[in-house]
Amino acid sequence: MKFVPDDPDQQSDVPFLEDARADDGWKGQSTSKSIEQLRAEISAEIGRLGGTMTRFMRGEYEIQGQKRPGAIIEYNIVSLDGQGFRGRIDVAGLPFEKSKGRQDSERTNRNRRDKSLQMALFNIREGLQGSRILQTLSPGYAALVPWLLTDSGQTFGQLWREGLGTAALPAPTKDGEVVEAEFTEIDD
């Protein structure tokens, strides 16, 4: 499976696995959870968000010439009126420095590949947990919507990132402020 972004310039700087630091926001560097354990925890989080994981497939992405271990997570959600929707979370682990020339380099590279995917899945699970809390605290937020699939096979998030869903900024009010939403304050 090869993934090639439409606009490689949109890719942010991605650190190598060995350079990912906790103080830069990366988590899961020292997780001892297996890929299967993390898959099960992600499935449970998707369930708590109202979806059902239907597929987990390991593979490899190629992004800007770098091979990155990854996975595709597919799920279904059903709306209140009973209509079903499919979603997909594409997970690309961090690239890693490949060991060459050593007798155990194949095993070392396999371990690094697994570690990269474990760390990526750990962060996806953390993100889904955070989304669940946000869904509880923010009325109208639907955590699984960005990964719903369109008729073209792209997710809503991919379309948005490509600029197809970006709306123009609203016009400023008379005092120069941009109002995107309004709410009513209720006195206790």
Question: Which ranges hold each PLM region?
Answer:
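Terminal, regulation- and interaction-focused segments at domain boundaries
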Residues: 1-44
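Short, flexible coil/linker segments at or flanking structured domains
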Residues: 21, 42-44, 63, 105, ...
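Compact, well-ordered interaction domains used in eukaryotic information-processing assemblies
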Residues: 34-88
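Intrinsically disordered, low-complexity regulatory regions enriched in serine/threonine/proline
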Residues: 1-3, 7, 89-188
